[in-house]
């Protein structure tokens, strides 16, 4: 019973770290979205002021926008635990199993 409680506490800690990491990522994405919307709006205003935007503006905008293909190919890493933590936990579980078998 006690080991199950410890296991649940570790799982809770992991989930809380994951929640924090996802919250941070969501905030970064919101900031990026606002920046992109701002660039789109400024491009729209520029196009209404002049029929053809200056080549320098187009080049400058393209430097700040992320490559969509690269973003889509990026894998999302949700693990908040290091491989060392996982190995330590596995070793602890093995030790607990050995103790309970004895």
Swiss-Prot record:
Keywords: Nucleus, Transcription, Transcription regulation. GO terms for molecular function: RNA polymerase II general transcription initiation factor activity; RNA polymerase III general transcription initiation factor activity. Residues 85-102 have a biased composition (Acidic residues). Its main location: nucleus. Residues 73-82 have a biased composition (Polar residues). The keyword Transcription applies. This is snRNA-activating protein complex subunit 5. The lineage of its organism: Eukaryota, Metazoa, Chordata, Craniata, Vertebrata. The gene is Snapc5.
């Amino acid at each position: 019973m006690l080991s199950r409680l410890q296991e649940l506490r570790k799982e809770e800690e992991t989930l809380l770290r994951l929640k924090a990491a996802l919250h941070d990522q969501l905030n970064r994405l919101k900031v990026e979205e606002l920046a992109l919307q701002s660039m789109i709006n400024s491009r729209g205003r520029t196009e209404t002021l002049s029929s053809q935007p200056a080549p320098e503006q187009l080049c400058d905008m393209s430097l700040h926008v992320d490559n969509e293909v690269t973003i889509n190919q990026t894998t999302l890493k949700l693990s908040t635990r290091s491989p060392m933590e996982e190995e330590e936990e596995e070793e602890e579980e093995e030790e607990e199993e050995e103790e309970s078998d004895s």
